[in-house]
Amino acid sequence: MQANHSVSYLYESSTSKRSNGLFSQTQKQGSFQKALSQTQEEIEDEDLMVDLNTGSLTPVKLKYWTQMSAMTEKFGKL
């Protein structure tokens, strides 16, 4: 997967958040792999993405982020 530097994103699933607000590396990897194993229709969680026009965080459905990521990867292979 190629890095896409035009889009900044924050991926930290709310289900793996610890009470002190910190994430361990294994929790991050587990959450990320869980999201990758789900189909696009199954992902209903929301996450925050940086709006590069305003610099603010905006809520985005992970389903749409995974679709956008897949399209970006396909365009990169052209």
Swiss-Prot record:
<protein>
    <recommendedName>
        <fullName>Uncharacterized protein YKL068W-A</fullName>
    </recommendedName>
</protein>
<feature type="region of interest" description="Disordered">
    <location>
        <begin position="1"/>
        <end position="28"/>
    </location>
</feature>
